[in-house]
């Protein structure tokens, strides 16, 4: 199925661009708006929102199956409520509804059985956690908790980094970098439609 749909598309990027432009009836007329849009998109400014939540980082529990066959995540509603209150009380920002980048730094408690030398090295980031929770589960947990509260939809996240650290002061540091405007009319229409659908 993949081969039928995408087999003729080149693997090399320059060849793919040539392939896309080969569909144009008048290449010069098509390329002019492409150049204009490229310049506009490159000039889009990004805003940064950074905040710290003083909790021990935990991944969401795996979904469990109830007796009636439905799936649920134990404690998910409490987590969502906590974060909703946290954002209302701490952050005075409009909901993010443009493409964004998400960075999650999870500081796990430094183990008590570490030597003082290792505790010091862990605090400055030279010794890192290689235990549960997994880095991707932490990122998913904390990006999900922003959905509908700080972030219109986590589908807006176009790039993300999740890192695990040790610290004597456990916490979660979240950074969002988001566009001041949309990168394209195409994406703007998609989000506008989703917003109208949720009203």
Predicted features by range, described:
Residues 1-199:
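Acidic, proline/glycine-enriched N-terminal capping motif
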